[in-house]
Amino acid sequence: MSTWHRGRDIVTANRVEKEGSLADFVEQVHSSKLVRVPGTAVFPHPNKESAPLALRANVEHNGVLHQHVVIFSAVPKTVPHVAKDDQVSVDNLGYADDGIVHVTLRYGFFDRPNIPYALARHGDEVSAELGGAELSDVSYFLSRATLRPRRTGSMRRWRKALFVAMARNAANPAAYFGLPADRTVVMGTQIDL
């Protein structure tokens, strides 16, 4: 267990460094002349402090951003079910007209954090913040980190190998969040361990 926790701490620290601040990213997007393409893109991400790697990669590699962007965080609660009125909150991240929002889904331990279902159930709230965006046909973008064990670092070699093996066996985020395979794009990056 200590190998898993230590490895996750290292990976999380490296990811946060690569991701950078979400507020800075939104400011950069707002002040730049990025080409905006039609449609809605949803980026599952654990928090609203840092920018999803898939969002950064999409902008850096393709030079475009969808007209409507939803950064979606699922937060587990210590109750069996969360009431519908308390499940979703939407934040425009500082600019009401840039088409970028952060959605927080709170769910209980008997609930499944199904993102398409949550968007369908709370679509009016999200669509209103996005200026009337169509949420029935969205694209989902996942960040996938490939771990690269290095000779240097704060973990012994055998612990790195064990952590990499455990990470490969971790749950598939697309299945966990109920994302449709035909509308999900996985964008990868490499993280040193």
What is each stretch, according to the model?
Residues 1-6:
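Alpha-helical membrane-embedded segments
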Residues 8-193:
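Cytosolic C-terminal regulatory domains/tails of membrane transporters and channels
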